Amino acid sequence: MKNLKERRLWLLWKKQERNGKTAKVPFAANGGKCGTSEEYKQTWVTYQEAEQAAKKFKGAGVGIVIPQNHFFLDIDHQDQNDPVVKDILSRFNTYTEYSVSGDGIHVYGLCDFSKLPTYTEDGRVKLSKEYYAHHPTNGMELYIGQLTNRYAAYTGNAILDVPLADCTTAVIDILNEYMRKPEAKAKEIKTTDLGKRADSIIQALRRQ
């Protein structure tokens, strides 16, 4: 995380109740308004500046805006020894930490932006609509710099304290195995079935 800590990508956050749920709301190191879009870029600071500023605000945490060609995977409320979690973590040899609550896991790393499933809307490249960025049932969130426009609540409570590594293949696998929307899966199965039927027909014709 050393290189990222030196870049002006950092902000603060605080917990607030919104619609009956607790949200981590971002704010600037000077206490002002902040966000993850380019219009707030001038409010982002280095990690050291954010860490110092957090001491001035009760209950404040430090967060990082996920930059292009980087990703953040949040596995919420899951134990490290859970079979699914073990399977996921085995694919990533990159910086990993405990979440703010201590009962979740954060994975940070690099990924090749050009190899990910995307589409363009209003001149902006976004993650394909076939995938969730925040899965509604399995508690997983996958944010990719410049595609999902989000920030991560950083803790520094490391599980695997190693340099950020390129995990493009693992990110694509996680998207397909854990973040794919049901309608996209159904479409894929239907297409596969049609392909099998076509192959069967062709084979039958050849035997005639």
Specify the residue positions occupied by each region the protein language model found:
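DNA replication initiation modules
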Residues: K2-K5, L11-E17, F27-T43, Y47, ...
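Short, basic and Ser/Thr-rich N-terminal targeting/leader segments
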Residues: E6-R8, S101-D103
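Residue-level detector of short, conserved catalytic/binding motifs and their immediate flanks
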Residues: W10, F71, T94, I105
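Short linear proline/tyrosine/threonine-rich motifs used for host-factor recruitment
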Residues: T22-K24
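An amphipathic, hydrophobic-aromatic interaction surface with interspersed Lys/Arg
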Residues: E51, R91-E97
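Electrostatic, structured charged patches in enzyme active sites and in nucleic-acid/phosphate-binding
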Residues: E51-A54, V62
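Short beta-strand
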Residues: V62-V65, Y95-S101
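Beta-rich nucleic-acid/ligand-interaction surfaces
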Residues: G102-L110
